[in-house]
């Protein structure tokens, strides 16, 4: 039924087979052997192997590059099939053009005319990808050095046009910029599955300054579909994050549609709260909406962290005492080290605890009540929840097997001297 519906309702490709060739590149693939592969639809004319052509972009029409089409592929299911030519309406993959980008148009040299294309939004947030230097570094990952991490990030640039990678003052740290936390979390998860081990910092937004030196920040339009009973909670949370309600209306199925204008930093760490507040039934989509004057400070987290004071293995006796101070992220047997965040404090301060502390053995016979220590099950954070949770003075340690939150400065004395404060 779906295939028949597509045939009945989707219009046939429009274009002139006798006109000059026009192929708009809409996505990029990458192959270790042939390099970048541009994928797009033939809008006009016909594209052939060994044909001379020009690559031109709608937003930079003066920059033109002469190329020769070395390979053409069409798609048969998930496989690429070599073809000699591609006609109107064909979705075609083109290899042999080293510096091809989304939005480029392939056309004949005699009549270079670029197809209109919406400019890709610039990155609005960044995170630092850092070589893991914790006491447990190198035990779980296969690729752990700065060279491994750098090569993997640069390879990602071949297919992800919204990503930016920059060097920093430290050779062990790279500034990675993207369109949002979700964008970067997908990259982090992919690297984790490929056996990379590294640490990431809290997401930060890009600020700009106008000609008068006034601070500007990126803004987002947030479109939200939420069940009617959760509307109040969502509006309240977003207004606390400097969001402005632009529009509100009822839609089918007992849902309300909200439109917010909100700073990009106001959405950092919010998706997890949003899913909790709506019990997983809300839908949140965002779109970049330019730069506007800075809206003021935003309080991200009202609670502190529970920090391990001693390195070793967490035991029931130590965890039983610690769980009274907040919500734990680890259970008995977990490896911990000094400066590692083991839970969320119920107060707005950081507390150091010794979860490796065992009960001292004495000659006094213990009662059964002393032996039956009941632990509350730990809260196991997903990658997105961990990225949302970390504060400005913390890092997320990412390995193929574990996610650990830690302080940037592990030594408690040095940490106090540095004077890190909560936002």
What do these predicted ranges mean?
Residues 1-423:
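Structural and coupling elements of P-loop NTPases
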């Amino acid at each position: 039924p779906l295939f028949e519906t597509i045939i009945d309702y989707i219009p046939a490709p429009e274009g002139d087979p006798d006109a000059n060739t026009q192929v708009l590149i809409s996505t990029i693939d990458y192959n270790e052997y042939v390099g970048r592969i541009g994928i797009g639809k033939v809008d006009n004319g016909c594209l052939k192997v060994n044909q001379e052509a020009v690559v031109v972009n709608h937003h930079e029409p003066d920059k033109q590059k002469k190329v020769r089409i070395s390979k053409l592929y069409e798609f048969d299911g998930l496989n690429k099939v070599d073809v000699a030519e591609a006609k109107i309406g064909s979705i075609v993959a083109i290899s042999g053009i080293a510096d091809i980008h989304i939005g480029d148009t392939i056309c004949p040299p005699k009549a270079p005319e670029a197809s209109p294309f919406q400019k890709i939004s610039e990155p609005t947030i960044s995170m630092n990808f850092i070589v893991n230097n914790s006491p447990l570094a190198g035990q779980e990952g296969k690729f752990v050095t700065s060279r491994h991490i750098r090569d993997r990030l640069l390879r990602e640039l071949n297919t992800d046009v919204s990503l930016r990678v920059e060097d920093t003052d430290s050779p062990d740290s790279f500034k990675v910029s993207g369109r949002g936390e979700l964008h970067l979390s997908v990259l982090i998860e992919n690297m984790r599955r490929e056996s990379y081990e590294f640490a990431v910092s809290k997401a930060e937004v890009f600020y700009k300054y106008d000609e008068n030196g006034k601070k500007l920040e990126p803004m987002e339009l947030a479109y939200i579909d939420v069940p009617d009973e959760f509307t109040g909670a969502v509006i309240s949370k977003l207004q606390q994050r400097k969001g402005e309600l632009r529009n509100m209306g009822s839609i089918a199925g007992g849902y309300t549609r909200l439109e917010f204008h909100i700073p990009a930093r106001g959405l950092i760490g919010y998706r997890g709260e949003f899913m909790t507040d709506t019990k997983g039934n809300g839908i949140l989509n965002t779109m970049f909406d330019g730069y506007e004057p800075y809206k003021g400070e935003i309080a991200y987290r009202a609670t502190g962290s529970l920090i391990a004071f001693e390195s070793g293995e967490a035991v029931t006796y130590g965890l039983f005492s610690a769980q009274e101070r907040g919500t734990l992220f680890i259970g008995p047997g977990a490896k911990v080290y000094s400066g590692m965040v083991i839970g969320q404090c119920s107060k707005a301060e950081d507390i150091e605890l010794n979860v490796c502390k065992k009960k001292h053995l004495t000659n006094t016979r213990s009662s059964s009540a002393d032996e039956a220590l009941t632990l509350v099950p730990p809260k196991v954070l997903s990658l997105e929840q961990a990225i949302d949770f970390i504060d400005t003075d913390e890092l997320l340690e990412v390995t193929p097997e574990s996610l650990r939150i830690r302080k940037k400065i592990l030594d408690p004395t040095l940490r106090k001297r540095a004077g890190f404060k909560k936002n």
